[in-house]
Amino acid sequence: MFNETPVFDYEDIQLIPNKCIINSRSEADTTVTLGKYSFKLPVVPANMQTIIDEDVAEMLAKDGYFYIMHRFDEAGRIPFIKRMHEQGLIASISVGVKEYEYEFVTSLKADAPEFITIDIAHGHAESVIKMIQHIKKELPETFVIAGNVGTPEAVRELENAGADATKVGIGPGKVCITKVKTGFGTGGWQLAALRWCAKAARKPIIADGGIRTHGDIAKSIRFGASMVMIGSLFAGHIESPGKTIEVDGEKFKEYYGSASEYQKGAYKNVEGKKILLPAKGHLEDTLVEMEQDLQSSISYAGGRDITSLKHVDYVIVKNSIWNGDSI
């Protein structure tokens, strides 16, 4: 029963260190395998318009990182696959579940992408199950990620339909207001929801949303994630597609949710908002810092690679770990 499940979120958890067995943190291996491919880090920038565009996707793929291209330039998806494949890079795109997407998936047979993410807000749906089955029938070699979901039942159903990975997280993101608009979601207990879902999963889980610090990546892996999708920490960089705005001499970048009126172009079924983030430096610098911090996490876990993070002990400290600190 759910009521017996402990409820906590990222800021409520501290991982407990083990004896370090490596000489330097730089020896720690942060690579992860998803399907037939290995990637430098178990993180993926959110497939949102203010986070990723074709140039960012190409940069990430060339540097050995996983990426998922957003689905909001529908006509550009086939040329994008071609562009990536011509350079010997993996193609990873998103689709929705509307009727015309079925024809689109069938049209990919000639040049199938390596990864397709079925990307809708409430992924525990018959429409998603049907789309998984259609993709698997038409493109059997393509790795299918389906989401978003927040329960073990949803994970099992999507896996049984043929999904190769599920994306867990309903509204915990910084620019997501699902919990406010609908009363539903995993906001405030995303890490516990991840743990709950991971116990039921037989295939990889991508934790999506609620990541506010690099330490949250290690916590996600501890509670069952194979990969961690991150929005706000990847927003606001020089390469980020979001519009740059100057306020009182300080530069900011737009960051908005995929279900916001700014993305939709209309105020209808809005479950996202727009915020301004102080402009950051280069995306590559953030990725390097994430890698170094994760290597430190592995050293504290007493291991050599990210699998060691799955077995560490933890304590629930209920909102006290900040102790007045900020980063």
From Swiss-Prot:
SMART domains: IMPDH. Disulfide bonds: none annotated. Pfam families: IMPDH. One of its GO terms (cellular component) is cytosol. PROSITE patterns: IMP_DH_GMP_RED. It comes from the Bacteria. It catalyses: IMP + NH4(+) + NADP(+) = GMP + NADPH + 2 H(+). Keywords: NADP, Oxidoreductase. CDD domains: IMPDH. The active site is at 176 (thioimidate intermediate). GO terms for molecular function: GMP reductase activity. One of its GO terms (biological process) is purine nucleotide metabolic process. Its EC number is 1.7.1.7. NADP(+) binds at residues 205-228. Belongs to the IMPDH/GMPR family. GuaC type 2 subfamily. PANTHER family: GMP REDUCTASE. Catalyzes the irreversible NADPH-dependent deamination of GMP to IMP. It functions in the conversion of nucleobase, nucleoside and nucleotide derivatives of G to A nucleotides, and in maintaining the intracellular balance of A and G nucleotides. This is GMP reductase. It comes from Streptococcus suis (strain 05ZYH33).
